[in-house]
Amino acid sequence: MQTFSEGTYDAVVIGAGHAGCEAALALARTGCRTVILTLNLDSIGFMPCNPSVGGTAKGHLVREIDALGGEMGVNADKTALQYRMLNEGKGAAVQSLRAQTDKNRYHTEMKRTLEHTENLRIVQGEAADILTENGHVTGVVTSYGGVFPCRAVIIATGVYLNARTITGEVIADAGPNGFARATMLTKALLRLGYQVRRFKTGTPARLDGRTVDTSALTMQPGEKVYPFSFLNDDVPAESAQTPCYLTYTNAETHRIILDNLDRAPLYNGTISSTGPRYCPSIETKVVRFADKERHQLFLEPEGADTTEVYVQGLSTSLPHDLQKAMYRTVKGLERCEIVRYAYAIEYDCIDTLDVLPTLEFKKVAGLYTAGQINGTSGYEEAAAQGLMAGLNASLQLRGKSPLILRRDQAYIGVLIDDLVTKGTDEPYRMMTSRAEYRLTLRQDNADLRLTQIGYDCGLVSEERYQKFLARKALREETAALLASRADQKAADALVQSFGQPPLSAGVTYADLIRRGIPLMALREIFGILPKVPTDVALSCETEIRYEGYLKRSRTEAERAKKMETTP
């Protein structure tokens, strides 16, 4: 094939999913001339599985991405259909924001952002090879012969490398949602000396919402919480948000699965690759948890301009006929019509023990990797890695020191540290239990932890930085007010209404919080902090309520940091 130069660039990003988009934007926004290669322009920022952003621990990642100057939180807020705060009945450390998003709008808004970003060129094409010289990356060759000379390459191919989809006996060499797969880059990775293995994930069927009966199901409305992005101040009212619905599998659902395990690819030998432990198929759940009479399902809208409904919790690779029978056993789905059948997908990924904490490969300088090719699962984990890979590539290109976030600084630090020091034998999912300093790594203080770092690296815009400084000052003012004295008579009446004895003289608002009085009650009774955003107020409340635990956690983090730096 005749090759030709496509022009010289600072960096090439291979893949335009959630990792690739963040990587390309981080590079371009910090002044690096960047190309992003995608197999299909219509798959930029595509959500091949769940139509949502955030969730337990994942919401923390999105807020951290945003605090550093990334795009996922901004785009999620633009396209959100519904917000909810998960684990509200638990402690502040594990509460996580989640949003249902409009899948098509998420793609189009992300594509628009890329198209209007200075220093960034988008090209549709498949990366065929990585060029190197003397142990350093020098460029990328495409399947059509175009050559992109560059000094940094970020591989963010998601689940597309040698992908194949499986639905019963029907096996297709394809990427998610029928998109073309990438067939050439695995050979380049093997040639460069990297290990490649096979992982597997899956997705549920999409239903025609007109054939779903929600009248007898439990509605899950949206909530008036705070947005993902620190650039935004508010979210739509509950009444303007789109509801989801709760339903369950039953004994008949389970019988169909158990009676047909010989036709289930996961159990008849068709699929042998490793799947995600924390997002199992319905077949796996029914077999592994045989004592459970039912499994929870959520019916989630795919968008405002489509009738498609995503059935969270009913991922499967059963044959088409069994899928139809199985779905119709579920309450509310008795007459449902499937518009997209469920499937499992197998794909190539690397061993992250071959990767440095900067997400640069060990053997080839300037070659980075991010996202599901690193053995992770989830849009948020991918976006976090993409941001860090792009930012570190940019810092290297600009002759600056790399950014390696510690485990006590960010969930992103926990994610990357786990990957490059422990590796993973299954699709890795971020969870709050993985973060030993989770009480200090809350989603409400992500900007305090990371925005200054992002600004110093050149990624946080001046607009975002000024807003951060204003919020920081507001936090300090709020903390000072809460340290001031409350009206004694009103304070006594309040604590007695909570079944507590009267207070001694000179009580402060902070004293009331330490006694378990919610800040929202203080705002209502005393009329304080009327204009302070909810997340700022709650952040200050958490710092007071868990003051002793936070002090201990920060002391432990300092001790661990000293041990790591001691020769």
Residue spans for each PLM region:
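Beta1/beta-strand and adjacent pyrophosphate-binding region of the FAD-binding site
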Residues: F4-A19
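Conserved N-terminal/central alpha/beta ligand/cofactor-binding core
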Residues: G7-T8, A23-D129, Y144, A152, ...
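Active-site-proximal substrate-binding core of FAD-dependent oxidoreductases
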Residues: S43, T203, E360-K363, S394-P427
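Internal hydrophobic alpha-helix adjacent to the cofactor/substrate pocket in enzyme cavities
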Residues: I65, A382-L405
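Conserved beta-strand-loop-beta-strand element in the redox core of flavoprotein oxidoreductases
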Residues: L131-V147
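Flavin-binding catalytic cores
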Residues: K187-R197, E252-I271, E300, L314-A344, ...
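A glycine-rich dinucleotide-binding beta-alpha-beta segment and adjacent secondary-structure elements
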Residues: Y310-T376, I404-D417, P533-P567
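Extended, charge-enriched "interface" segments that sit outside catalytic cores
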Residues: R434, T440-R442, A446, T451-P567
